[in-house]
């Protein structure tokens, strides 16, 4: 059974949410949530609702506002009793996951919940009043997702804020999180083509946020927050840490450092200066995880490999070294040129200098060039495997296989860590403001 949300990491500080104006594109039809598999020609928009026409941005709502009127188009207010009906009285076997924020249940919204509702599977997140997420993060999700509509953002169906209860109702994502698929020990079904499609979808979601009239910085990009539907279409979820971008002649937003250690951009960790390129760094971490099949932070690995970026980034521009560390579960599924293009993109996104990172629109363009080639390549691979044949679409040097141990098993040769030309950045002393990855995942 897929899930919509996974057990979330702990966040220790909360940033003040401000205005949430978004951009609509005049003269274009909005095709929202009726998504093609390739996400092309689908336009995101701001949900207009009582704002004087034209879908103008709305001021953020507070709890009192939301208790009386949803204020946002296509977002419903549910009573707590209706939430109990939708989850069969919050049955334990309906639990999809739980963490510091509370519990996520699967549910069904239908006629038994409210007359006129067509039966719809949903995921219902109930916040723990004493948990790590508070009203500010809950409000951020409602205020952002209440106004934003895009094929690569998870859809908010409704909410409940009756008395002290805080619940969010989302569309159900049948395949669960990218994290669940990418890091499973056995049976990984994420081919090279699927990974690149997921990366493209996530990039489109970020590009949409950054391209708003007043840009939005997502601030919490990670595999646990990328959800997949039955067609492996990816959507960004969990907007509790989202923040309005700089306005006017501002170059950055100064804010408390929040996020997940291993994903946060170094300049943000050290200074609290937040820009859209902080998200680009997080996207680079995501690409690296998908290329290597390894978590951004993992203290069970060798000491020098604890931080994936510090260990692997210097190797991304070296063909032979990269082939030795690439996820072996993708063996033979990619061409060398495509691999090096994605690795080079990840390398740029992970630049220590924010100005050296590309904009997300450029990232989308680069990943788009891989799509057609990837579709054709997967078809070739499927045909070859159906005939009992195998093929390797890249060349590896003879020494890339490493040596064999006494039992005849291959073992890889150790790699050098950080490039000598790059100065190390000491981020350990800043970790107190970031969350450690939750060891309990769904």
Curated annotation (Swiss-Prot):
GO MF annotations, alphabetized: ATP binding; protein serine kinase activity; protein serine/threonine kinase activity
Composition-biased stretches (Polar residues): 395-406, 430-442
Residue spans of biased composition, Basic and acidic residues class: 414-429
Residue list for modification Phosphothreonine: 79, 255, 260
UniProt xrefs under InterPro entries: Kinase-like_dom_sf, Plant_Ser_Thr_Prot_Kinase, Prot_kinase_dom, Protein_kinase_ATP_BS, Ser-Thr/Tyr_kinase_cat_dom, Ser/Thr_kinase_AS
Main location: membrane
PANTHER family hit by this protein: OS01G0588500 PROTEIN-RELATED (PTHR45621)
Record protein name field: Probable serine/threonine-protein kinase PBL17
Lineage: Eukaryota, Viridiplantae, Streptophyta, Embryophyta, Tracheophyta
Gene name, Swiss-Prot/TrEMBL: PBL17
